[in-house]
Amino acid sequence: KTSTRTRCAFEVAARDQGAGVTYLESSASQIGHKESIKDTARVLGRMYDAIEYRGFGQETVEELAKYAGVPVFNGLTNEFHPTQMLADALTMREHGGKPLNQTSFAYVGDARYNMGNSLLILGAKLGMDVRIGAPEGLWPSEGIIAAANAVAEETGAKITLTANPQEAVKGVGFIHTDVWVSMGEPKEIWQERIDLLKDYRVTSELMAASGNPQVKFMHCLPAFHNRETKIGEWIYETFGLNGVEVTEEVFESPAGIVFDQA
């Protein structure tokens, strides 16, 4: 998958530590075309000390990890975004001013994919109060929920899933969201998602529903918060929305900490 923040973060971090970096783009390499993932893993593992993979299938990064013989970092798949969780946990610790196991946060929107899944597991592992606010059909899979609940029993985390966005955000310190249509999905899906998720848009009213005047807004980016992108303008012209999952007012407010998070 394409990348701005994840690729830059890995490359800057590697070079800060004195490591060399090679970027292999799928369209300019043989990965998955003329050479299997298994064979690619065994070649790259002999040349490099570590591999970061960003793509669609979780099974691909797991196959790389199985055969490479070196550490493999998941830079994002459809199912998980673990390196983003490191950034999110650090950001909540920095801006929350208290231990993570005393911190509460909500994720509102489409919770079936990498951010919803990862935030649920993150909150469970760190003993946090984590809320998912989404239509029931857009919750994480039963397997992900069961895994999170099992971890929560050991860590003392509190897990709540609700279709009521106001209930989800009540009393939290942080409100997270993500785009409603993921990379690779067709434009035709937008109308369906807007109809499903319009009540989960992060507005000033939803922020106020937390009852916490210090509540912060988080988003892994990129965000559709205005008309300043080609897609943002297309959404406005097609559906009349200036900003989709979050309004410009919230995104640019002092509550927004998305650039520290990024």
UniProtKB/Swiss-Prot annotation:
Chief location: cytoplasm
Impact after mutating residue 36 to R: In strain: CCUC 7757
Site, Important for structural integrity: residue positions: 94
Alphabetical keyword list: Amino-acid biosynthesis, Arginine biosynthesis, Cytoplasm, Transferase
MF annotations from Gene Ontology: amino acid binding; ornithine carbamoyltransferase activity
Residues where L-ornithine binds: 114, 178, 182-183
Biological process per Gene Ontology, one example term: arginine biosynthetic process via ornithine
EC number: 2.1.3.3
GO CC, any one term: cytoplasm
Catalyses which reaction(s): carbamoyl phosphate + L-ornithine = L-citrulline + phosphate + H(+)
Pfam families, per database record: OTCace, OTCace_N
UniProt-recorded name of the protein: Ornithine carbamoyltransferase
Organism from which the protein derives: Neisseria lactamica
Originating gene: argF
